[in-house]
């Protein structure tokens, strides 16, 4: 039975006979509406910002998006549309674009990998007056390195960005919640698999009528497959929604307290010690995070280091002076004694356990109850958080 996507992003028609087991959590609601909202929640997306279409696979979602963008451009002008694609895109993207180019319905530019990722500057340089779409995945095939989707989206300046984000979703990489105008996900669930095509409202208004014909038909609503996708997401990434909650609480606390940002990519403990000595700042003697990982530093203004150490590190069983072998990394950095502040470095990785989440939440909730006092200039070796 065909399903129709209405303008509010929900399916108007649903199967009338569903096994009770597949209605888990629906509480009498439209099953598809329920799954749409839950999947968006797991991704950390705003349900009011995105429209969702279920397809047979992410491959179908990718081709729908490319075809719609090319068709819209051809309807507006006789100039052949230009598509930007990454060098490590899935076959559904490259084959679709190349097939359209062979039919002389579009031209395309392939952006090569630089240091195993797509360089936003190269994307900017590839933009032409007839560019109608950029297809850059969240992770690059084979090498599985992350692309800077946020930066790429900025340089495109209004040109739609479509991204395959299956790996980002299944790895729980919340810091790259799809900033793309549209995204696709594959369920990774075998023969019952379905795909997801998510589109922001502004994209839906322009390209939506060109997808599935003018009627916005999304094919048969494969409820068992959609349910299986939802269950797979919740089982493989049981902490994804909580990770997003932690992230929001962390950002809220970060804005509340005075803070600094300490980039740690490629920095070793020895480098930090040498740099601190050079600037007359006491050495931390604390190892920094693994090379290449970003770092956030948060400190509470007006509270002595010993006070917060007792309340946080001792009470919550988190040791100072070493990287905790968990998914959150908390350590104290010494700065000139006249400031006597505590700096907390929190790094969220992709495989948090429930116990890890509880410990991070306890620390953040405690910090959220502290009222900032006074003012503290950041150490000269750190840059301000942006």
Curated annotation (Swiss-Prot):
The lineage of its organism: Viruses, Varidnaviria, Bamfordvirae, Nucleocytoviricota, Pokkesviricetes. The keyword Ubl conjugation does not apply. This is NifS-like protein. Its main location: virion. The keyword Transcription does not apply. Keywords: Virion. One of its GO terms (cellular component) is virion component. Its cofactor is pyridoxal 5'-phosphate. Pyridoxal 5'-phosphate binds at residues 58-59, 184-186.
